[in-house]
């Protein structure tokens, strides 16, 4: 098994840090400090070496230290392709983020070719009751760990959808170009939907077979494109293309694309109770979310033979002893680079004795 892990992390003008340099090993790392000391900021910085906007989904303008025009994050990282230096930097004046791999610029959605990450934060505990956009993004992040090209597909789909909306809004009379865009969207949609369904199938198998202290979940996706694939619809790309053509006038009026894989919802049920997770108690929702993360870790390692970096923000808060003990044993068994934030070591003293402690 190959581990993805950081050797070092350097922050400049990032959030509350003017300068911070950490040297770390391929071991569990515990960031300990009072609330507001910057523990979650460090996790967020690491998460920016994965497709997307990090574990907070923050606007780039918010991550620079107050009164500074730029910020940067550097990491020496054992990647899928070996030891490499990654840099991501942002300038307020240009409102651009630049990411580099060994001093060569790469697109944000290419990061999954090099890294693999999973995270769990308190903000995610409301994912079942929030809008479907957040749940869909959560599902796609899971897929990134199993198919590195999925992030690029999602990025391309969003680009072509934006182009289609622009052509419709500006009443550009170019049916041929619009047809080409819709055909590209349809082809990419098919790949995205298949990737999601395939991942959910294997995730469900993993959940069913994994015995732990957390409730089992039933996973599904509510989406027209995904359902057509499940129903065995033939010529799915042509069907999607035809639907996009049919909705042109409607989409022109409302100013957005009303049909497609960007409308799908990731649904999660409490298996034993047979109710949607959003109807469960907050404690049950957190437990179900942890169960999904555990299944993702198991499936990722089994399928790809790669252990991702795991970022856990205050994950032990409000867990009973049995579940806390299970998690510490599970993480020890996985032998991966795990980052945990906490305000104290109470109840995890044994686990802490095997970890690298960083006090903030």
Swiss-Prot record:
Annotated SUPFAM superfamilies: P-loop containing nucleoside triphosphate hydrolases
GO-annotated cellular components: cytoplasm
Entry keyword set: ATP-binding, Cytoplasm, DNA damage, DNA repair, DNA replication, DNA-binding, Nucleotide-binding, SOS response
Key word Manganese present: no
Any GO BP: DNA synthesis involved in DNA repair
InterPro entries with a match to the protein in the record: DNA-binding_RecF, DNA-binding_RecF_CS, P-loop_NTPase, RecF/RecN/SMC_N, RecF_2
MF (Gene Ontology): ATP binding; single-stranded DNA binding
Signal sequence segment: none
Binding site for ATP: 33-40
Pfam families listed in its UniProt record: SMC_N
Subcellular location: Cytoplasm
HAMAP family (UniProt xref): RecF
Free-text function comment from the UniProt entry: The RecF protein is involved in DNA metabolism; it is required for DNA replication and normal SOS inducibility. RecF binds preferentially to single-stranded, linear DNA. It also seems to bind ATP.
Family membership noted in the UniProt record: Belongs to the RecF family.
Protein name as annotated: DNA replication and repair protein RecF
Organism: Rickettsia canadensis (strain McKiel)
Gene that encodes it: recF
